[in-house]
Amino acid sequence: KYEHKKDVTVVEMLPYFMKGVCTANRGYLIYYMQKAGVKLLNCAKLIGLDSGKAIVEQNISKGVPNPYNTWQPILPENIPNPLAKKIGNETKKIEQETDLIVFAVGNKTDDNLYFSAQVANIVPEIYNIGDSSFTGKVLEATRAAERLAVGI
């Protein structure tokens, strides 16, 4: 349990969390999320919402990197790593009970998911922050999430 007796799960579509962030900052944040019991799901995506449940599809092939591994350097896109394992296509669906979902998706404003979930009344509370409401940087989305979390 994290703060307010809530379990926290972070879903990331990319193989690495915080790619492009300074290695020291990335290591520090991932270490403290792990220490606090935050569950990290990389190579995963939210595919649906149903009656208080989030439905996530996660790639579980052997090439998927360990999201808690911070000592392995993340190379830029233009530098090939011949030793990197190829990520396969083996996936599994995970249904997780949720009290609250916070979306921070992409870098192009797209609030369709927010309004669809609101119209369907999927969950009692839903908030529209980050790139879902306006295009910005990760830092801005993180600050918006912190302000929202403090207010909840």
Where are these regions (language model features)?
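A Rossmann-like FAD-binding core segment of flavoenzymes
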Residues: Y2-A117
